[in-house]
Regions:
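Hydrophobic transmembrane alpha-helices and their immediate junctions
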Residues: 307, 443-481
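A juxtamembrane structural motif centered on a specific transmembrane helix
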Residues: 6-11, 16, 26-91, 304-305, ...
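N-terminal signal-anchor transmembrane segment
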Residues: 34-35, 58-172, 199-201, 480
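Aromatic-anchored transmembrane helix interface
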Residues: 156-167, 183-201, 207-232, 245
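Alpha-helical transmembrane segments of multi-pass inner-membrane proteins
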Residues: 241-271, 281-344, 453, 457
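Long extracytoplasmic/lumenal interhelical loops at the membrane interface
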Residues: 382-397, 401-405, 409-443
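Flexible juxtamembrane loops connecting transmembrane helices in multi-pass membrane enzymes
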Residues: 275-280, 350-353, 366-398, 418-421
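Transmembrane alpha-helices of multi-pass inner-membrane enzymes
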Residues: 95-100, 293-296, 335, 472-485, ...
Length: 531
């Protein structure tokens, strides 16, 4: 069936062997994959679609018009609605409330189905793939209501098939041939590492178990495909600041996570009021991760509008309320970095910030000293927040021992030989709870090369694109690396790894900068950058 040329580092990928008339079939296949060979505008402005999948789609609509009538008008109306919704100020509030109301009412499945339906609608009728990212984050938050029984959600497999079909339609209608933006080679290396991890050690049953495949494929090949899909639309002209929209998605995801934590305490208010100590819930480390990477996004908007400092305070307080020690330690460090970021971005307000900082420093420290022992009383062991017998120490040593057992490929992401030490919730692998130990123990030297390559690509990209906006992305990435030192973090495919992939695709499209610009003037004026 010919060949599809992937424009990336000069490689040509042949998907199918040649048969019949290669030239003709190749031409048709390229027309299908490259449905739009020039930048397009929003859905409401697409009037000249005349080739590839788009032309075939128009013919289908014309056929339906003849048989049913009004199909083309209906599709055009749906495209207009999707486009207006994505670009409106109602997008985030509507998506947020769509799930929040039903979760508060104890009907998370209903809210999840509504969010998934919105995601499918946007895939079919919106040409901007970024529009589905916040619904994906919301769907991950639905899982907090089923944290002990995630497999029970498999009964909704049918709506997943509908979403997959909608994704294929979206790819055919809107995507173009992707190009490497700077991170692809590192992602290919990670894909190889996750697939080869455990070679010569892990059993066939463990390697091909559904949970193991979810992580080995989800962290590698699936993220690579997600990167290529995002890159296929990255060069299209937009009429909004894409970097700012990505920060809004991180910000909104953090706010919704804060809502989920607050909802838990509302449901268990009587128990909390007994001693004012944080309560245990199994998804606290996942919540801490989402809150932590959202802090820099909130700080970015606080640098523009001081009202967003309330959100910064809310996110940090919810980090404390998770009861996660990682949230306390890394959250405090990130809060200080975010405040320094706001200070740096507003030279005209620095004198005011210095006065506020000096006045509030002692009360803030005193408040933390008073609150932390009470809030984290349930986490204390012999008066210490971190016990020398903590399982994380055991797992770090175990990761090094597993690396010694099979230094080239490690023991594999799906290996269960450490289950007697610690076994997580249903649907999770046996974590080492440390980024370095996870790479060494699960993937060996191949993993070191893969993740080291990806880390180098991303850091180099952030340095080359450095600006006030990309500094916020750099802080979010740093937050993800921090939380990964004590928790799964970046080794959770959905939504953690996916958010990082989408974030760096946005960074790739930022202009190169020789130095970090300091914007002088009104801090309320946003820095506008377009693809």
């Amino acid at each position: 069936m010919g060949r599809f040329r992937l424009v990336s580092a000069g490689y040509t990928i042949i998907f199918f062997p040649r048969r019949a008339d290669p030239a003709e079939l190749s031409r048709r296949f390229l027309m299908l994959m490259n449905a739009f060979d020039k930048p397009v505008q929003s859905n409401t402005e697409q009037t000249g679609r005349g080739h590839g999948f788009a032309r075939m789609f128009d013919r289908v609509c014309a056929f339906l018009d003849e048989r049913v009538g009004g199909a083309s008008a209906l599709v055009a109306a749906c495209q207009s609605v999707a486009d207006r919704f994505w670009h409106s100020k109602l997008y985030f509030p509507v998506c947020f409330l769509m799930l929040a109301v039903f979760m508060a009412a104890g009907l998370p499945v209903v809210g999840g189905v509504l969010v998934m339906s919105t995601l499918i609608f946007l895939l079919l009728f919106c040409d901007d793939l970024l529009s589905i990212l916040f619904p994906v984050v919301l769907l991950a938050m639905v899982g907090t209501e089923f944290y002990d029984e995630l497999y029970s959600l498999l009964r909704f497999w049918w709506i997943g098939l509908l979403a997959a079909a909608a994704l294929l339609v979206h790819i055919g209608a809107y995507a173009r041939a992707p190009r490497n933006g700077g991170c692809m080679h590192g992602m290919v290396a990670v894909s190889v590492a996750t697939l080869l991890g455990g070679l010569g050690f892990i059993s066939r049953e463990e390697y091909f178990s559904p949970t193991a495949l979810y992580y080995s494929l989800g962290l590698g090949v699936v993220m690579l495909l997600a990167y290529l899909l995002c890159r296929s639309e990255a060069d299209r002209a937009r009429d909004y600041d894409v970097a700012e929209r990505m920060l809004q998605i991180l910000y909104a995801g953090g706010l919704f996570t804060g809502f989920v934590v607050a909802l838990f305490y509302v449901r268990n208010l009587q128990e909390f009021l007994q001693d004012f100590a944080t309560l245990y819930f199994k998804y606290r480390n996942f919540s801490a991760t989402m809150l932590l990477i959202a802090l820099p996004a909130a700080a970015y908007f606080a640098a523009h509008d001081r009202r967003h400092f309330l959100s910064v305070a809310f996110l940090y307080f919810m980090l404390l309320m998770t009861g996660s020690r990682s949230g306390l330690i890394f959250g405090t460090a990130m809060l200080l970095l975010c405040l320094a970021y706001v200070y740096y971005c507003n030279p005209e307000r620095r004198a005011f910030y210095r006065r506020v900082g000096l006045i509030s420093l002692i009360p803030a420290v005193a408040l933390l000293i008073a609150l932390v022992p009470r809030l984290f009383a349930s986490r204390m062991v012999d008066g210490a927040l971190i016990s020398p017998d903590d399982s994380r120490y055991t797992f770090f040593i175990q990761g090094l021992l597993d690396f010694v057992k099979n230094p080239l490929f490690g023991c594999g992401l799906g290996s269960m030989h450490n289950a007697p030490i610690f076994l997580g919730v249903e649907g999770s692998i046996v974590w080492y709870h440390n980024l370095i130990a996870q790479i060494l123990g699960s993937m060996g030297l191949v993993g070191v090369v893969g993740y080291g390559w990806l880390f180098y690509d991303r850091v180099r990209l952030l340095w080359r694109k450095r600006s006030r906006t990309t500094m916020a992305f750099a802080l979010s990435y740093f937050a993800m690396l921090l939380i990964s030192m004590t928790n799964p973090g970046m080794f959770c495919p959905m939504p953690n790894a996916l958010l990082m992939v989408a974030m760096f695709v946005v960074v790739e499209r930022q202009p190169d900068t020789a130095a970090v610009p300091v914007k002088v003037g009104s801090a309320s004026t946003p820095e506008r950058r377009l693809f």
